[in-house]
């Protein structure tokens, strides 16, 4: 598992992980209310739903979260996949951001971005286009796949780990991620995400694993 090994997600019954920062830490860009709903209600609901779906499935209870995602994807169990993937996606997202983050990175990740996108500015343009262009609910991701960085988007609960990709960064573009503070202005939210929220240390740690 990527960074999520530290989140109490590795075995049934799954537990809502604590945020790695205070809910108020993203002011003035986000209010604590956004995190109270996003983490405390939406993410928590996926955790509880997953536990309820697994309560009579002893074989699945022996699997870790990534194994459950893989099993439910292969067996087309949509309910289990959706909730398991959303538990994983959200925990990964919480580590993808940090207070006073964003801006231009340095080190190996910047070198790789320049190699694969031409420049950091071009990466930002492409990432913003993919994140804002996702129709309806979903996610925008920076992944490492086929020996290069790629930007991909997934609809609803879709996750790159179900397709053999290594996720480095996640941007949640479900409306519950930004609607309290930004209403229908997803482009503004994505712009704030890039400029003020990305945890580049986390991204680089995932790249160098």
Curated annotation (Swiss-Prot):
It catalyses: 2 superoxide + 2 H(+) = H2O2 + O2. Its EC number is 1.15.1.1. Binds 1 Mn(2+) or Fe(3+) ion per subunit. The keyword Repeat does not apply. Its cofactor is Mn(2+); Fe(3+). Gene3D superfamilies: Fe,Mn superoxide dismutase (SOD) domain, Iron/manganese superoxide dismutase, C-terminal domain. It is an enzyme of class 1 (oxidoreductase). Fe(3+) binds at residues 38, 90, 172, 176. InterPro entries: Mn/Fe_SOD (IPR001189), Mn/Fe_SOD_BS (IPR019833), Mn/Fe_SOD_C (IPR019832), Mn/Fe_SOD_N (IPR019831), Mn/Fe_SOD_N_sf (IPR036324), SOD_C_sf (IPR036314). GO terms for molecular function: metal ion binding; superoxide dismutase activity. PANTHER family: SUPEROXIDE DISMUTASE, SUPEROXIDE DISMUTASE [FE] 2, CHLOROPLASTIC. Belongs to the iron/manganese superoxide dismutase family. Destroys superoxide anion radicals which are normally produced within the cells and which are toxic to biological systems. Catalyzes the dismutation of superoxide anion radicals into O2 and H2O2 by successive reduction and oxidation of the transition metal ion at the active site. This is Superoxide dismutase [Mn/Fe]. It comes from Rickettsia bellii (strain RML369-C). The gene is sodB.
